[in-house]
């Protein structure tokens, strides 16, 4: 009877595929400003990519596109029969996430394959039709809630199972396979979103990995306080933007190369690299959504656990510089990064360039963008600035001194985190009652086009201000994005020639060496004596 009711609703939905999008479609159907502000304060989330195909160690879902009929049949019919994660203990995941300073979780309730990790009436291709027969989504939400971690869900509008079941060729980024142009798929997806947002209580956020029109409206109507991340705010994938983006945004990145579990041919970022990504993202005003991919038996790979525990130690001492912070007047001075408390003039100076800082060793550095006041106080996060173990003769008080060349900071790391008495991860100095000491420049990327006659890219920018410098250098950078998903950016930026400027205004430069048939992103660059800043990214196709 349940399936009959669902099929009836599906047929009705096919006649009115965007009914929810057209009902009460006023200003209320959007992310609420106060909820986005809350989201920005959280700063650090855990992404969990898990699917039935983790059993064979393939890229999550995508192996279905271009697959043979036999492969698809066995994927849909056989893989669920052997999916039995008997070592699945979400309480352990949640406890580890809590230690690591995670504030919210986003779980892949349904990835592109269409396999549903919850007890759903919308398809037989779901977790209840496996030997496991437990609602994994429900258990994850409950376990993370118990730790005070806000629950979020990922839902893919693309659904390879639905396309296969309806005799359609599996494809990406073509209109006929998208819900917006496919009433039956839209109704199927809308029914799933309604289920997810009515079965499990309040859900703080939902991530639509594809065309969100017609689905985000269902989410906002069902739970008005929900935050739609991808589908409503910027969510760069596998990259941190070169500039702070406007408003709330979220970078989502993997620990290794893959989103799902990879038993072989995987290489991981170090714990230090993961911490650096968190620092850079927060310095630019965004959230970091760091991914794990559980094994088919339900355990986290040991490499992922190790990195979360390294992050946990760093966050145990330094979490104050991550939560409820906003960007400083500039994001960084070389390898020293900044976050500023949202409601006070407290600045966190996150020092990445003093690698392997030995305990008990004084370090001195100068900041150009910060000015002290009479009320300024300095300390190193995590330590009391009074005691160094076994050395009662030392007085490791952090000090600051304002001079003509900048703010001088003298600090000692005194906490013993490792047996070697070396600490490879950032040290954070907290400065209270400080002011900006510079005005940064501003560049805009205005146009990028292919000049067929000259066989080169003609790029145009606008230097809006030099800041407080008499001269700067301007230019452009490019990166190859051919064949990438619009959210995915994994290739490195390639610098172009810089030219000096002593005045504001438009500038045009040519970029040579771009390959025929490729698609590139282009961004303007301005190099100040203290910092390099960027304009927004534009797309350029080379014929």
Regions from the language model: what does each represent?
Residues 22-440, 530:
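Mature catalytic domains of secreted/periplasmic carbohydrate-active enzymes
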Residues 15-16, 298:
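Residues in and immediately flanking transmembrane alpha helices
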Residues 437-543:
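Short, surface-exposed linear motifs at loops/turns and structural transition points
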Residues 17-21:
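Sec/Tat signal peptide C-region and signal peptidase I cleavage site
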Residues 1-4, 97:
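Positively charged n-region of N-terminal signal peptides that target proteins for export
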Residues 6-15:
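Bacterial N-terminal signal peptides
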């Amino acid at each position: 009877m349940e399936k009959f009711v669902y099929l009836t609703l599906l047929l009705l939905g096919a006649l009115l595929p965007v009914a929810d999008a057209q009902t009460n479609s006023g200003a209320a159907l959007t992310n609420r400003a106060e909820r986005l502000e809350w989201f920005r304060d959280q700063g650090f989330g855990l992404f969990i990519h898990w699917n039935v195909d983790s059993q064979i160690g393939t890229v999550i879902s995508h192996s279905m596109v271009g697959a043979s009929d036999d492969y698809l049949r066995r994927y849909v019919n056989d893989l669920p029969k052997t999916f039995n994660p008997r070592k699945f203990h979400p309480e352990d995941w949640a406890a580890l996430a809590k230690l690591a300073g995670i504030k919210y979780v986003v779980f892949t309730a349904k990835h592109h394959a269409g396999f549903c990790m919850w007890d759903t009436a919308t398809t037989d291709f779901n977790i209840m039709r496996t030997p496991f027969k437990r609602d994994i989504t429900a258990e994850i939400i409950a376990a993370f809630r118990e730790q005070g971690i806000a629950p979020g869900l990922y839902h893919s509008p693309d659904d390879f199972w639905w396309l296969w079941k309806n005799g359609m060729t599996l494809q990406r980024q073509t209109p006929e396979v998208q819900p917006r142009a496919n009433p039956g798929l839209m109704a199927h997806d809308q029914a799933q979103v309604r289920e997810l947002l009515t079965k499990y209580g309040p859900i703080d956020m939902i991530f639509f990995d594809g065309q969100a029109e017609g689905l985000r409206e269902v989410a906002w109507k069902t739970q008005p306080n929900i935050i739609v991340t991808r589908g409503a705010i910027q969510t760069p994938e596998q990259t941190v933007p070169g500039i702070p983006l406007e408003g709330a945004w979220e970078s989502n990145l993997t620990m290794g190369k893959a989103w799902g579990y990879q038993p072989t041919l995987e290489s991981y970022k170090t714990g230090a690299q993961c911490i650096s990504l968190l620092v850079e993202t927060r310095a630019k005003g965004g959230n970091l959504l760091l991914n794990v991919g559980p094994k088919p038996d339900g355990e986290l790979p040991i490499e992922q656990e190790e990195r979360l525990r390294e992050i946990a130690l760093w966050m145990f001492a330094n979490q104050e510089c991550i939560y409820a912070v906003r960007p400083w007047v500039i994001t960084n001075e070389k390898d020293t990064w900044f976050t500023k408390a949202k409601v006070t003039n407290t600045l966190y100076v996150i020092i990445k360039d003093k690698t392997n800082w030995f305990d008990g060793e004084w370090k001195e550095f100068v900041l150009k963008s910060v000015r002290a006041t009479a009320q300024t106080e300095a300390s190193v996060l995590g330590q009391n600035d009074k005691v160094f173990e076994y050395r009662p003769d030392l007085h490791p008080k952090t000090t600051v001194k304002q001079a003509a060349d900048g703010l001088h900071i003298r600090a000692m790391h005194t906490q013993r985190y490792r047996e070697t008495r070396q600490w490879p991860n950032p040290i954070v100095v907290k400065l209270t009652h400080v002011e900006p000491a510079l005005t940064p420049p501003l560049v805009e990327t205005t146009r990028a086009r292919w000049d067929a006659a000259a066989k080169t890219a003609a790029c145009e920018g606008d230097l809006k201000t030099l800041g407080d410098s008499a001269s700067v250098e301007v230019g452009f950078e490019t990166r190859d994005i051919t064949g990438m998903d619009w959210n995915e950016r994994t290739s490195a930026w390639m610098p172009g020639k810089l030219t000096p400027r002593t005045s504001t205004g438009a500038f045009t430069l040519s970029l040579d060496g771009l390959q025929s048939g490729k698609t590139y992103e282009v961004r303007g660059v301005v190099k100040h004596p203290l910092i390099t800043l960027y304009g927004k990214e534009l797309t350029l196709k080379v014929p």
